[in-house]
Amino acid sequence: MDSGNIGFVLLCAAFVFVMTPGLAMFYGGLVRKKNVVNTMMTSIFIIGVGIVMWVLFGYSLSFAPSGNAFIGDFRWLGLEGVSLTEGYTDDASIPNMVFSAFQMMFAVITPALITGAVAGRMKFKSIFVFTIFWSLIVYYPLAHMVWGQGGLLGADGIGALDFAGGDVVHISSGVSALVLCILLGKRHDYEHSIYRIHNIPTVVLGASLLMFGWFGFNAGSALAADGLAAHAFMTTGVSAAAAMLSWMFCDIIKNKKPTLIGASTGMVAGLVGITPGAGFVPMWAAVIIGLTTSPVCYIMISYGKKKFGFDDALDAFSCHGTGGIWGGLLTGVFSCTAINSSAGNGLVYGEFAQFGAQAAGIGITIVIAVVGTLICYGITRLLTGKIRVDLRDELMGLDVSQHGESAYPSFNGLDN
């Protein structure tokens, strides 16, 4: 075991933890003020649920070497038997417990991403139950299939590359968000009102915390304080910067002015796009990934939602699902064995196999997310009854109806 690597990965785990409150602020700033508390709560509560589930059975189901390609076994329930001195794999330089702590933070933020799609119209108790079953049915199996020993999609399977969560985190949550918002239906005034962002500074602060945590998210996935971690750190920043610029350019073309919300959203889109390939693609490719991910997400947000008629309230699918798919495919275009020996060369180097593996992995991830979300929705409806809030509660705002709180109370206890 290497003490430097242990300290580095634990620090990165703390960075990733910050992403969840950062997401709460990012989402909370985007909604109307009557839904701020509820929107932030639907991210924050998952810190509690996600960590407890991970310790009790999540890590075991995700990473225990079960011998099958789909899910782990129960040998590490309650983290019993998870070593403090031996690695998850024979060549690991960090203890199994440290690896578990790092992955735990991924399991927390992933279901939180989904909640943005249904902001302002889903009962809190239903989100609570849905999150539990989604983690069980979608996230843990996918984590095992992509990153676990003998997993269907990873190095022991079809060979799809996912350095830090393109499939496991972004595509799974983004596609699930799309399915859930379609099942739940549109907000009552979706096509008749102009939704105004209530607090732009909060959005910027949230996006900044997300990017701060994302450096640990991607660099930490090298699982060592080495050159690969440095490379992933740099590709992360480069892609985010390029994506911010290209989103601003899209804003200028469409609206004649750059916007602060656009710059913040573009930065997040670039972070999503580079996640699957951060430790596999050259630095120049990170620029291309960032520059192209923003326009793809921008088109989905500006035109795709209207064209296909779904109400993805805070663009969880349009940003994370679309950006994750695009980034995953471009990983198959630009991946380079010289950067990471575990990767195959991509299309630009004249080889097709890696791109094919990426496409197959993305396709399987989408199927799992769609089917799993349908199952989770059915279970949630069975256990909680009606999932959507009543029209009166939706009009009044979920802060009061679901939590009895207001983010901005006036002297008489009501929103000003």
Q: Which residue ranges define each predicted feature?
A:
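Glycine- and aromatic-enriched membrane alpha-helices
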Residues: M1-N416
